[in-house]
Amino acid sequence: MQPHQGITGSEQTIPHRLFTDVLHRAIRRIVEGEGAHPAAAPSVRVINLSIGVPTRALTRRMSAVGRLLDWLAHSYNLLFVVSAGNHTDAFTIPVYGAHDIDNARLAAKRTRFETSLLRGILPPGDALNALTVGATHADGLGGITVPDTAWDLTPPGDPALYGAVGPGVGRSVKPDIHHSGGRALYTRPIVSPGQSEVAVSLARTATTGPGLQVAAPGRGGATNRTVFTHGTSNAAALVTREASRLFDILDSDARDPEDMPLPDPQYHPLLVRAFLVHASSWDTWDSSFRNELHLNDQDARRQLTALLGYGRLSPSRLGEAATNR
């Protein structure tokens, strides 16, 4: 990737280079090496990718880079943790929802559901063999004072409004799981007489928060600058950390002598993915989304699975189990 020549703060792939070839070569150099050069990191088993091609949201057919990830995951026995992608364009809500925060939250959630076909998974998050991660409206900043010009439209811990939604190819479960992506605020619209809808867009909160605090380029070469961000990339990075911890647990083989032996290391990437999914759940999302979106019992599970995947990851459930399991 390199800085975008026309959009400040954005990145683009190298011109005149096919991205799938660049990615294939990079992974091959990690695992196998290239030419006279040995493998750069042959012990690597989990790889985090947060790219999100905004012009290629999933509709029906898997992207070329998604197919490449499926092949790489199978051929090299790797776990790819991939961000679902962000849809940061403004959206509209009915004008009646702009009068108070409760109505605005409900209107935003319904709009997110009704426009889900336009907010599909971004490549390479459409890969079947990858663990695709969505974002929740959560971070560690604590209580904040929301200015009068902004709205906090998402209930704490709910799926973020900016996150891409499923389903995946062939109605597969995508995103697989959700994790903390950082809270995002939205600009409070000004309602004019005669309007039936108002536009709501993301507020700029990089300096003041909320969001996840991350390192950022500093002026004059300074190395201590941080900003607040939100996105599925943040969530994917946190899930990658949990995946690495699970690999360490499996490699340590720290079990009681009377326990069954752990599976062979060749199955560890698949096991780690299963553990992450198993430690996720809908929890209260099931009832709240059914009620607020007025879903009927016949279609609710299918529709909610497209929005929620397997649910929100609970890190406290990872690497542990009850004594009878």
Q: Which residue ranges define each predicted feature?
A:
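Acidic, Ser/Thr-rich peripheral helices and adjacent loops at domain boundaries
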Residues: F19-A26, T92-R119, D152-P156
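Catalytic metal-binding/acid-base residues of hydrolase active sites
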Residues: G52-P54, G85-D89, T136-D139, R183
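Active-site alpha-helical elements of protease catalytic centers
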Residues: M1, T20-R25, V227-I249
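Extracellular S/T/G-rich loop segment that most often corresponds to the catalytic His/Ser-adjacent loop
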Residues: R110-T240
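Subtilisin-like peptidase catalytic core
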Residues: M1-R61, H268
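Secreted peptidase-domain scaffold signal
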Residues: G85, L293-R325
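Active-site neighborhood of phospho(di)ester-bond hydrolases with catalytic His/Asp-centered motifs
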Residues: N48-S50, F80-G85, V133
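An often Trp-containing, charged/polar helix-loop segment at the C-terminal end
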Residues: I249-S288
